[in-house]
Design a protein with these regions (language model features):
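Aromatic pocket-lining residues of Rossmann-like dinucleotide-binding sites
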Residues: 146
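Long, basic/Gly/Ser/Thr-rich N-terminal segments
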Residues: 1-92, 96, 297-310
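Walker A (P-loop) phosphate-binding loop of P-loop NTPases
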Residues: 136
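Conserved lysine of the Walker
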Residues: 139
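Phosphate-binding P-loop
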Residues: 112-126
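N-terminal pre-Walker A segment at the start of P-loop NTPase domains
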Residues: 97-115
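Post-Walker A alpha-helix
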Residues: 142-143
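Glycine-rich, often acidic-flanked micro-motifs
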Residues: 2-22, 26-28, 125, 129-132, ...
């Protein structure tokens, strides 16, 4: 007897998604009458046709990237169109969703020649502004401060950057959820008990932001790299010259795969086209006190002064 798997349709990352795996975070339905862009399938190990050469890390073939989360699942991302999930003995759907919506989507976007930046993006006065930075820099916390000031989130974690017909960089919305550490929740006066902790991260939580989510593509207005400073100082400076390329390369989601995928030249050209249209800034935050609202004010002032359109 053949079992028929239930399928779910969603719209996220600028893509119509058909999935055999429920992804409740993606509560935006697929666009009616549009073609399905990507398919997420589950397969048992015997029928998956997956070859994993590297015990740790990624196995990269011409049109396929494979990796394993130990004892949980095998993942195969193929041709920018398909994600295969193979459950293993300790399969956990919550943990697997983190990888599907993170690493798998980041790789799939690169296979489609769409730049995935690692950070958060917010909508301000009809433009998208990305906040990129290393892990722990405070990207989601700064984005949350923007939300609390009445602005809307476009993406958190994986930021898809595409181009319009007029070659203007555009940010595609991901899905209405943030990930915040308990320390940030406390600083914002939010009760951690009201939110779901992320798998294996007991002090990091999933924060739904459906009412503060911008669900349409929006032109990119600027890029802000968030870094930790020394002491209480906060500041912002405009990035000049080749440093903009360094920022885009360093903060590409799973950028370590660019070489194996043969995409270094593509990435350079793509970055050139972005930097030709928008300015990049570095924002320094305090490490001794909670300053996201100060940073929001400085960033908004930079926008109003016209420095992003010079």
């Amino acid at each position: 007897m053949t079992s028929i798997k239930k399928k779910y349709t969603y719209y996220a990352f600028g893509l119509n998604i058909l999935s055999e795996l429920p992804l409740p975070e993606l509560n935006c339905p697929a666009i009616p009458d549009d073609n399905i862009d990507i398919v997420i399938k589950t397969r048992d190990l015997a029928n998956a046709e997956i070859q994993l050469d590297e015990e740790k890390g990624f196995t990269v073939y011409r049109n396929e990237v494979v990796f394993e989360v130990s004892n949980t699942a095998l993942f195969s991302i193929r041709n920018g169109r398909e994600i295969i999930v193979v459950p293993l003995e300790e399969f956990d759907k919550d943990r697997v969703r983190l990888y599907v919506l993170g690493t798998c989507m980041g790789v799939l976007l690169m296979q489609q020649h769409i730049l995935p930046l690692h950070g958060s993006a917010v909508a301000v006065d009809g433009k998208a502004y990305t906040i990129v930075g290393n892990s722990g820099a405070g990207k989601s916390t700064l984005a949350s401060a923007f939300i609390n000031e009445g602005y809307k989130l476009i993406s958190d974690d994986v930021i898809p950057v595409t181009f319009s017909d007029k070659n203007i960089p555009v940010i595609q919305p991901s899905y209405p959820q943030q990930k915040l550490w308990e320390e940030s929740l406390n600083n914002f006066g939010m009760d951690a008990r009201a939110y779901q902790p992320l798998f294996e991260r007991e002090t990091k939580y999933s924060i739904p932001v459906k009412n503060s989510f911008h669900n349409q593509p929006i032109p990119l207005g600027g890029i802000f790299e968030l870094v930790k400073g020394s002491g209480e100082s906060v500041g912002i400076r405009k990035i000049e010259g080749l440093e903009g390329f360094r920022i885009l390369l360093h903060h590409t989601f799973r950028g370590s795969l660019l070489q194996k995928l043969g995409l270094r030249e593509w990435h350079f050209i793509y970055s050139s086209n972005i930097l030709r249209e928008v300015h990049t800034f570095q924002v320094t935050r305090s490490t001794s006190k909670f300053t996201p609202y100060d940073l929001v004010s400085k960033i908004l002032n930079t926008m109003k002064e016209g420095n992003l359109n010079a």
